[in-house]
């Protein structure tokens, strides 16, 4: 019994081992058959020939780019960019030459300008305003008169009646070359007149630019310095350290400099009042001096100097002429 059990055990173990082997060998082709069906996909990685073919396919230019191929592509793209830039430059130069040739050809230019009568005139709005005022018989125009002049002379303003009128109004109010004067009571109509300021005598319209230009910019500064010297010199001469002041019918009072400064700053009456009080404080102990005039009387300068100062002040626009 014991022997039979041992034989049974030994037979069972051998049979079990021998039984597993044929089962594995039998089932192995079944497991490899589906892999064999996908042999075309997995074949490059299954043998050495396949690996060589895969590496050759990877190195071929039809696959993804390598560092060498990317560098070559970037170099070729840079060369193409340079060629494009050079081509654009040559194209721009050619267009510039064509434009210059068209501008230099009078026949083409005349045809272009003749076909467009409503072209904007080559003048600034300030130049157009000055042109309108200078061409008027009385050297003055209202705002509507300026509009009418521009509409009658330039077809552009007749065809386009919006936008440019606001620009005319803004330039009239901002430019110092134009001065507004009130209309007299016996003059029928509406609106104030616009005239050219006396300081605009040296202003002209540029032929090439179409804008206002000044003949001699340094001349106005020279006249301004002479004007200031003419105002301050006679009054500052009343100082005890200076030359004797000329007699204009008024005594030499110490507030002459303050009066001149007030006159230069648009005739400020407060400066006269302060100067008058200072003069009274200084002149109180000296009874033998002439009685100083009231500030109301000082607002009118001596007759010999009044007209000249008023004309100069009006010329430089320090206060309105009215």
Swiss-Prot record:
Expressed in the posterior half of each parasegment just anterior to the parasegmental boundary. Pfam families: Forkhead (PF00250). One of its GO terms (biological process) is mesoderm formation. Residues 31-81, 94-120 are annotated as: Disordered. PROSITE patterns: FORK_HEAD_1, FORK_HEAD_2, FORK_HEAD_3. This is Fork head domain transcription factor slp1. It comes from Drosophila melanogaster (Fruit fly). GO terms for molecular function: DNA-binding transcription factor activity, RNA polymerase II-specific; RNA polymerase II cis-regulatory region sequence-specific DNA binding; RNA polymerase II transcription regulatory region sequence-specific DNA binding. Keywords: Developmental protein, DNA-binding, Nucleus, Pair-rule protein, Transcription, Transcription regulation.
């Amino acid at each position: 019994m014991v022997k039979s059990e041992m034989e049974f055990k030994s037979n069972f173990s051998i049979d079990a081992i021998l039984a597993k082997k044929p089962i594995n060998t039998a089932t192995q082709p079944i497991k490899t058959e589906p892999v064999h069906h996908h042999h075309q996909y997995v074949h490059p990685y299954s043998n050495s020939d396949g690996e060589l073919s895969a590496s050759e396919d990877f190195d071929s230019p039809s696959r993804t780019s390598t560092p060498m191929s990317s560098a070559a592509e970037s170099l070729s793209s840079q060369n193409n960019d340079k060629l494009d830039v050079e081509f654009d430059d040559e194209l721009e130069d050619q267009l510039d030459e064509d434009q210059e040739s068209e501008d230099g050809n009078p026949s083409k230019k005349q045809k272009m300008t003749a076909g467009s009568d409503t072209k904007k005139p080559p003048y600034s709005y300030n130049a157009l305003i000055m042109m309108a005022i200078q061409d008027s018989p009385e050297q003055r125009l209202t705002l509507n008169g300026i509009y009418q002049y521009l509409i009658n002379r330039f077809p552009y303003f007749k065809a386009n009646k919006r936008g440019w009128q606001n620009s005319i109004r803004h330039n009239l109010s901002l430019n110092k070359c134009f001065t507004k004067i009130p209309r007299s009571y016996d003059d029928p109509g509406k609106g104030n007149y616009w005239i050219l300021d006396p300081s605009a005598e040296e202003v002209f319209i540029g032929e090439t630019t179409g804008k206002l230009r000044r003949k001699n910019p340094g001349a106005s500064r020279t006249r301004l310095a002479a004007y200031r010297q003419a105002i301050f010199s006679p009054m500052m001469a009343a100082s005890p350290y200076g030359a004797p002041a000329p007699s204009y019918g008024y005594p030499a009072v110490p507030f002459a400099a303050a009066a001149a400064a007030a006159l230069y700053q648009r005739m400020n009456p407060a400066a006269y009042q302060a100067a008058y009080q200072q003069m009274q404080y200084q002149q109180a102990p000296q009874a033998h001096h002439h009685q100083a005039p009231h500030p109301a009387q000082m607002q009118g300068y001596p007759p010999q100097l009044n007209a000249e100062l008023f004309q100069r002040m009006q010329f430089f626009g320090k206060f309105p002429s009215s």
